[in-house]
Regions:
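Glycine-rich flexible loops
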Residues: 1-216
Length: 216
């Protein structure tokens, strides 16, 4: 079982890599479940590119810090809280603001599986609103659209990924954006090839592996 410090450091590493890759900006946030009613998340005021473990706060599902102090979570903490509330097997939630995925939702283009690793994501549903998910009601609506899928698109806004580990969630956040980039670029030439259901299943059998996630 990882220690609290190790979990915080893994979150810090993930956020800083995503920020460096321009998958998140100054407002992106990532979390990890601590138990049934609390989770770790980077503070709303933290500078993502120079994040440290001191910038990770533990909050309950209502966004209240459980260890005292005045460090507050991001305003969109309901993204994380409502996923954890609805899906007990999920242990990590990332909210990113990537370019290519957002371009597609801005124009109403549905992401398709055009890249082998995106087979792990399956259908990629999209919210029909660009508004911040900063209330429990909005979080519940997002979770309803997401269902049991690993990712959901927020129209003209960003992406939410959910997984059983920080490593897996990081990989999903990268895969969805790489898939969007390839789909967009292929659309400049013609109609992108979309993996069939059978091809996606074969890819899932080979690609669902922590050792491969680590190569992301």
């Amino acid at each position: 079982m990882p220690s609290q410090h190790e979990i915080k450091q893994e979150l810090v590493d993930a956020i800083r890599m995503l920020e460096s890759a321009e998958y998140i900006d100054h407002n992106g946030h990532c979390s990890a479940r601590r138990d049934a009613s609390t989770f770790y998340i980077n503070s709303g005021a933290s500078i993502r590119g120079s994040l440290t473990v001191e910038d990770i706060v533990v909050v309950d599902l209502d966004g209240k810090p459980v260890d005292g102090g005045n460090v507050k979570p991001p305003l969109e903490f309901p993204i994380h809280a409502e996923v954890y509330r609805a899906r007990p097997k999920i242990n990590a939630v990332f909210h990113t603001h990537p370019q290519w995925s957002t371009y597609l939702t801005m124009t109403g283009v549905q992401q398709k599986v055009v890249y082998a690793q995106a087979s792990l994501l399956g259908p990629m549903p999209a919210m029909d609103s660009p508004m911040s998910v900063n209330t429990r009601e909005m979080g519940e609506k997002m979770v309803a659209v997401m269902g049991e899928q690993p990712v959901v698109m927020l129209k003209a806004h960003g992406v939410v990924a959910a997984a059983e580990s920080i490593l897996e969630c990081f990989a999903y956040a990268v895969y969805v954006e790489e898939n969007a980039r390839r789909q967009y670029m292929a659309m400049q030439i013609g109609d992108p090839y979309v993996f069939s259901d059978a091809e996606q299943e074969l890819c899932r059998q080979k690609l669902r592996s922590p050792s491969l996630y680590k190569k992301t």
